[in-house]
Amino acid sequence: MRALLLILLFVFISPFDVSADGRRPLDLPSGGAGDGDEEEDAPETINFWGGEYEGDAFFWCLDKSCSMSWNGEIQDLKQEFTQTLNSLSSQAEFGVVAFSEGHIAWNPMPQRANPANKGSAIAWVQSLQAAGWTCLGPAAVETLNIANQCSKAMKQMLVLSDGEPYCNGSNTASQVLNDVAAANWQQIPVNTIYIAADSGGISFMQQLAQQNNGTFYQPQ
């Protein structure tokens, strides 16, 4: 009788897998429990002025010098920025700096691209007025300082301008290259977008992108 009971116990218990600590494992859906985190950290592709950029955080440095009003570029900037920012998911982060004789930042810290922050940044960019010199250097450094505070893995910086950096009557191209190189200790890609019809600023914008692992783009 005892032998029969042992056989019956073995038949009923043996089909169930038991983990090393004696607990039966739980049934998990295919892919495990980490799918949500992977989706949250996935990079996004944005289209800004016709150029495509992939990342999970985007930081703009935007020219608002007087020449940006000559052919309506400042209005185009506002439209392009609005469309691009609205395309970001709330998982992405971003920052915006605008420059002319001086520079101003929408926020000194990187922010999530949630509806409230996107609305605030769009309203801020829409209020920009074109005036003054093209003092890019300090603005680019400020943009990098904001980006450096972001913990995302695929950060991208986008510099938009319609010419070489002239500040208070002097060409500051060499100084800008040096200042950006010193500030970019995280080696964030610095992508440049040159929107002028002439070729005056192409060489500088190409060099700025090349020295910082970015791309140069000139819309046609």
What is the predicted function of each stretch?
Residues 4-12:
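Sec-dependent N-terminal signal peptides
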Residues 104-105, 109-155, 189, 193-204:
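Von Willebrand factor
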Residues 49-58, 66-96, 110-119, 134-135, ...:
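…and closely analogous acidic/polar surface helices at protein-protein or active-site interfaces
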Residues 55-58, 89-95, 151-156, 184-191, ...:
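Loop/turn elements at helix/coil->beta-strand transitions in domains of secreted/extracellular proteins
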Residues 64-69, 100-105, 130-133, 163-167, ...:
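Solvent-exposed loop/turn segments at secondary-structure junctions
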Residues 32, 163-212, 217-219:
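VWA/integrin I-like adhesion module and closely mimicked acidic/polar interface patches used
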Residues 63-65, 77, 96, 143, ...:
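DG-centered beta-turn motif at the end of beta-strands
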